[in-house]
Amino acid sequence: MSLAITIIDVDAAADNVYVFGTLTASGNYSTGGDTLDFTTVAPQVAASHPPVQVWVGGTTGDNYAWIKGSALNNQMVKINTASNTELGSGAYPARITGDTNIQFEAVFNKLI
């Protein structure tokens, strides 16, 4: 299941659009990463192309790594546990679904 995106702020700087928000994990994690689908928020950020950079961080000690996709709907977030092994495939553990502070920053090229 995709990570749910909640936008907190959008900053349209000179050449880029910076999007700040939170992610909510639910359902199951798949080996290789969970989908981060920006089409669900594209109208709010005026984006038609995938981000050029994404940062994700939480409060559980797990490590979140962005895997660039080719479109708005196929970005991925890979999760490694505190012991630096990938989170196992299956239901998300309570520490992640209960983390209400999984933050992200995404940078998009500004549409001209």
Language-model features, listed with the residues they occupy:
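Extracellular receptor-binding modules and their adjoining Ser/Thr/Gly/Asp/Asn-rich linkers
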Residues: 1-37, 99-112
